[in-house]
């Protein structure tokens, strides 16, 4: 029985890994600027050879992340203790004290991890962050669905969620916005909450409860 349980877990890990690579790979294709003739692809790339981000909010989020990493707060300066962005609504600027910080925290963390192994600019890390984070949605979907159906049902549900048109069109490589969290984090919340309720051990309940709160 124990060996069968181990085999089931290993099989699930392999399937999840394959699904992750699949959904990430589909999102990564945006970096190739498919459909654009090779002779004019350079027009769609910046000076570093990286494709331009797909919409303006991505550049705003990148700038906020750069500010956070540079001086520890969002915006160019502080006004009455609140971050003030001088690049928005120029020349007056605007208050960014209410800016949602998760995307900057996650991206700066990934930047630190990646640069432990190779040099990569913050812009490059940000370019891939949306595709990476959104692909993690396969984990909670597969685990949760596998427990109430089977491998085939879990695979189908995972692909439906991870490749949903509205989700994938807002989380491909080069789309650097908070949409990456809109499906992934709620799914992890549901998974952790269910585990907190079902677990027999108090310590496990506490751990999963904490994780579910963090995921909100």
What are these regions (language model features)?
Residues 1-13, 28, 101, 105, ...:
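Membrane-embedded, hydrophobic transmembrane alpha-helices
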Residues 32-64, 70-71, 82:
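Low-complexity, proline/glycine-enriched hydrophobic segments characteristic of transmembrane helices
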Residues 15-27, 110, 142, 188-192:
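Hydrophobic core segments of alpha-helical transmembrane domains in multi-pass membrane transport
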Residues 68-73, 113-114, 136, 143:
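Sec/Tat-exported extracytoplasmic proteins
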Residues 90-105, 115-136, 172-180:
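Loop-to-helix entry region of an early transmembrane alpha helix in multi-pass inner-membrane enzymes
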Residues 79-84, 128-147, 152-216:
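Membrane-embedded helix bundles of polyisoprenyl
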Residues 1-45, 56, 155:
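Start-transfer (signal-anchor) and selected internal transmembrane alpha helices
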